[in-house]
């Protein structure tokens, strides 16, 4: 019987291993499993960890990711690596690691490549299809549920048809990407496979969406097999509720006359009951993360920067600790900023206003090799587990590090803060333990996930807040400064206006979060408690409002309606409205090539003006130089060809493009887009 499992175990509790054991328990005689992750290099980490902890051999496990560079870097530093994915990267190719396999002869034509030397076998493709356990970026499997290059679509579909599906950290997808993932859930159910979804903050709204997708897949299976009824199991498990209480497991049956609304209500009630029990269990446990609100007199960028700086200084004073020699104090702090340009700008601000602090800016647009070595240092320094013997405090690695020793030795100050200013790349998948954090909030999820990087390994008892949240986030301050205070502020990343219903009633975190005496305990309860946390309620409203168009009875049911809409045969629904990877543009600049006279002087005027615009947006000097160089080439090409043809130039994990708009009323007008 197909089974849908929700695993809501806490962070660091071994969810990945439990997911695999659950899948093997559900199908003990012939386990074939796909573990799909949204994190490219974390896919490698997961594969390696499972291989060691579950004692798997190369002929039992295959790992697939999107590029060779990440694979090579990981292999060189396997012991220390634990990487999260960056903002919406492209996934152009897939590289597989694992033993070669034989497949049935009738499948061989699908796994052949034509080269100059003739037809050769695609051994990587065979590995992906035939291995018993596949650990993969979800980009590989996503083609099974949407129009794609047909060879890739068929290969991914064959793998999905023959495997049970594990979706780790399923709440890490934005609503558009979530719909793409739910199509996989629907297909897996249609082919009678088990689906296991896990996350420490798996909200009721998300669980309902997954349940609706699975239920619609079962309905498709019922129609396909022409059965009078089709049953499936549902289970909810976690590690927090008293082990004396068995996990919630029940069976739902679809018939020709099924009342899906009654079934859905039953699911909602049971899931909510479980969340209530989970919140009660969490409330009885010691809290290791306490947040404090930082009031702001005005919502301006300068006030926001000042508030973040003051917060960091306060937290350093609270949580700095003495080195072994006892002469100087240090701390490692995290400042979470929503977007790359804002993070870079804040790093410059800190460097100018807190000069004895050591600042590292960690973001997705850094050169790959730079980012890798930053991660290596952070992974080494911020692994702060205690063992009661050689590692009594968890700070031993930092105190014994030669670079840290030199920096402390040459510092003229008694207090030496080490500050990482990071974008959301730090939120998920990084096994780091910071002393404190300042959070530029984008959603409740961003607060809970970032807080999970504070006091993570040492789990010290705290008496004062070790996290500070400014009253307003950067984007709202920018909107106010531009006299657009009602513009969405919790976006890119964030959920505000996703369902296109209405904006949030306000952007004041003093009102959106359930503070008590200006303080707030941060754990999974904050994400689940929609009754007391307005922020969580609004986030869930947007997620549900978007998802119900595709799977809910209340919406259009584009992907679950028995009466198939013809739009399902078009690519736009998949690639434009519900893509897995949606490029979020950082900036949009208007250019009219017809107004540029041929010659270097006129081009330089455009380039210089663009340079000023980028600088105002907080773009750093080296980045601007790169953009300027490429912009000159683009403009020269536009003038030479008498039109603005599409040109793409890579920059780290991003790039930009100049393109001609087709509408007659803006003919000849071009737009320069920069994305990450």
Give the residues covered by each predicted segment.
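N-terminal helicase ATP-binding lobe
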Residues: 1-676
């Amino acid at each position: 019987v197909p089974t849908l499992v929700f695993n809501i175990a806490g962070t660091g509790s071994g969810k990945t291993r439990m997911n695999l054991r659950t899948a093997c328990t559900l199908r003990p005689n012939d386990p074939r499993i796909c573990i799909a992750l949204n994190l490219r290099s974390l896919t490698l980490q997961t594969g390696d960890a499972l291989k060691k902890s579950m004692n798997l051999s190369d002929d039992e496990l295959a790992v697939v990711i999107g590029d060779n560079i990440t694979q090579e870097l990981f292999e060189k530093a396997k012991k220390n690596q634990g990487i999260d994915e960056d903002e919406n990267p492209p996934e152009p190719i897939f590289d597989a690691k694992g033993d070669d396999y034989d497949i049935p002869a009738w499948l061989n034509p699908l796994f052949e490549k034509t080269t100059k030397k003739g037809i050769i076998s695609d051994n990587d493709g065979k590995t992906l299809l035939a291995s018993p356990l596949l650990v993969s970026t979800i980009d590989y499997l996503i083609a099974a549920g949407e129009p794609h290059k047909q060879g890739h679509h068929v290969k991914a579909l064959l793998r999905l048809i023959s495997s049970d599906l594990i979706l780790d950290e399923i709440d890490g997808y934005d609503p558009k990407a979530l719909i793409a993932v739910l199509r996989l859930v629907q297909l897996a159910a249609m082919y009678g496979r088990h689906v296991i979804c896990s996350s420490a903050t798996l909200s009721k709204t998300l669980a309902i969406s997954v349940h609706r997708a699975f239920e619609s897949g079962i309905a498709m299976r019922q129609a396909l097999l022409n059965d009078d009824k089709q049953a499936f199991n549902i289970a909810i498990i976690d590690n927090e509720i008293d082990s004396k209480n068995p996990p919630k497991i029940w069976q739902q049956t679809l018939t020709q006359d099924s009342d899906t609304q009654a079934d859905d209500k039953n699911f909602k009630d049971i899931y909510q009951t479980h969340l209530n029990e989970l919140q009660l269990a969490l409330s009885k446990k010691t809290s290791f993360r306490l947040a404090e609100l930082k009031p702001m007199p005005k919502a301006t960028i300068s006030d926001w920067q000042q508030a973040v700086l003051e917060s960091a200084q306060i937290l350093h004073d609270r949580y700095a600790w003495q080195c072994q020699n006892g002469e100087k104090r240090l701390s490692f702090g995290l400042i979470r900023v929503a977007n790359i340009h804002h993070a870079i700008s804040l790093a410059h601000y800190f460097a100018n206003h807190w000069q004895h602090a050591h600042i590292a800016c960690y973001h997705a647009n850094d050169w790959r090799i730079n980012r890798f070595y930053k991660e290596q240092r952070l992974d080494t320094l911020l692994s702060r587990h205690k063992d009661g013997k050689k590692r009594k405090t968890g700070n031993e690695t930092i105190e014994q590090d030669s670079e840290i020793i030199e920096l402390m030795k040459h510092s003229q100050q008694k207090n030496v803060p080490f500050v990482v200013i990071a974008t959301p790349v730090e939120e998920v998948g990084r096994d780091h333990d910071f002393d404190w954090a300042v959070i530029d909030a984008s959603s409740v999820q961003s607060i809970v996930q970032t807080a999970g990087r504070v006091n993570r390994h040492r789990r010290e008892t705290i008496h004062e807040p070790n996290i500070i949240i400014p009253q307003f986030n950067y984007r709202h301050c920018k909107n106010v400064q531009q006299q657009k205070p009602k513009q969405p502020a919790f976006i890119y990343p964030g959920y505000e206006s996703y369902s296109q219903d209405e904006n949030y009633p306000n952007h004041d975190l003093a009102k959106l979060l359930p503070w008590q005496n200006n303080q707030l305990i941060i754990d999974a309860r904050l994400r689940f408690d929609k009754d007391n946390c307005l922020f969580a309620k609004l986030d869930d409203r947007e997620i549900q409002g978007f998802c119900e168009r595709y799977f809910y009875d209340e919406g259009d049911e584009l992907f679950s309606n028995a009466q198939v809409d013809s739009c399902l045969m078009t690519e736009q629904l998949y690639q434009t409205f519900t893509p897995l990877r949606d490029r979020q543009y950082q900036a949009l600049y208007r250019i009219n090539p017809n107004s540029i006279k041929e010659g270097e002087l006129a081009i330089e005027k455009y380039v210089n003006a663009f340079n000023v615009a980028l600088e105002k947006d907080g773009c750093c000097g080296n980045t601007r130089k790169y953009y300027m160089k490429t912009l000159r080439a683009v403009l020269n090409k536009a003038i030479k060809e008498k039109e603005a043809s599409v040109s793409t130039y890579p920059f780290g994990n991003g790039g930009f493009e100049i393109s001609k708009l087709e509408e007659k009323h803006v003919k000849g007008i071009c737009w320069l887009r920069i994305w990450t």
